[in-house]
A protein has these predicted regions:
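C-terminal motif of bacterial Sec signal peptides marking the signal peptidase cleavage site
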Residues: 13-17
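Cross-family detector of peptidyl-prolyl cis-trans isomerase
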Residues: 2-8, 18-156
Length: 156
């Protein structure tokens, strides 16, 4: 019996050691892929006139809003829809209060700084400013560029 367990263990070890290592993640190559995908998305959606900010977030202020502007320490109350570039909706929220200094994706922390109370903003977030090379749940794959339409209900 011990002999069979030893042989079985050795066979298992042999197969486990044959597993190939994953290629190292190349952030600059992924950034280039994201940029190409975003440009294709913008070309296919002529109604979107987004600006790329210094941090790499694309944004379009759809409705300016007339209230206070967000700051890095603001709490922003929003309604939002999140989609992948292919249009697949992965999330939606109403009346969500988000503190920009908390643990949220960088794309929101940076992109919502372009928003004011009462406004609507479109954010196109490269993967590095979203979930990076890790999937999030079942609906957001690794290296996904995310598109958000966000209504700003209040800023405090």
């Amino acid at each position: 019996m011990k002999k069979h367990l030893l042989i079985l263990s050795l066979v298992f070890l042999a197969f486990a050691s044959c597993k190939k290592d994953e290629a190292p993640f190349d952030a600059s190559a992924q950034a280039a892929k994201d940029e190409t995908a975003i440009q294709a998305y913008l070309s296919a959606h002529a109604d979107i006139n987004a600006t790329k900010d210094a941090n790499g977030v694309y944004y379009q202020v759809i409705t300016e809003g007339n209230g206070a502007a967000a700051t890095a320490t603001s709490t922003v109350t929003v309604n939002y829809i999140g989609k992948l570039l292919d249009g697949t909706q992965f999330d939606t929220g109403t009346g969500l209060a988000v503190k920009l200094s908390d643990n949220i994706i960088k794309g929101w922390k940076l992109g919502l700084l372009h928003a004011k109370t009462g406004g609507r903003i479109l954010l196109i977030v490269p993967s590095a400013l979203a979930y990076g090379n890790k999937a999030s749940g079942l609906k957001i794959p690794a290296n996904a560029v995310l598109v958000f339409t966000i209504d700003i209900l209040g800023i405090s």
